[in-house]
Amino acid sequence: MTFRKIVPPLVALVLTLPLAASAAASYRDVLDTPARDSAFAAKSLLNGVANAGQRIVAVGQRGHIVLSDDGGKTWTQAKVPVSSDLVAVYFPTPAKGWAVGHDGIVLHSADSGATWTRQLDGRSAGELMASYYAAQAAKGALGPADSAAALVDETKRIGAQGAENAFLDVWFADENNGFIV
């Protein structure tokens, strides 16, 4: 009697294992996957908008960045190297702009938003933060040794989490000096 109760779930498990293995093998990280061209990009959820001179630049889900040169009547999609959700965009000059979003992504454009390059992501941000605080601790710039060691350990822990933290806003005073939060 117990054998009959065990066999169906066991068969179901055996039959689904190849599907799970196939899904895992085909997974691509959104930080390594460029945003897909989509006719619906301008109609998808857009989280942030900015002006790049007369151009309107909007950012949204799946790495979509759309541009309008006619006040929003028509939109074109920009080339974006990631498919992480983007939440904010800012242009301190008509040509130079910054966009931020999930997975710790920071993008930069030097051509009014037509193309974007990755400046930082959650993987490299953790490594950068850990190396900075380790160097500061080595110089004695972080205060007492036990506090400095705890801070260095915390930055290493944050870095080990990977790219799960988001940047939610961006602002630049000029094309080189700004803040991301």
Model-flagged regions — what are they?
Residues A21-V181:
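Residue-level hotspots at or immediately adjacent to binding/recognition sites across diverse folds
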Residues M1-R4:
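N-terminal secretory signal peptides that target proteins for export/translocation
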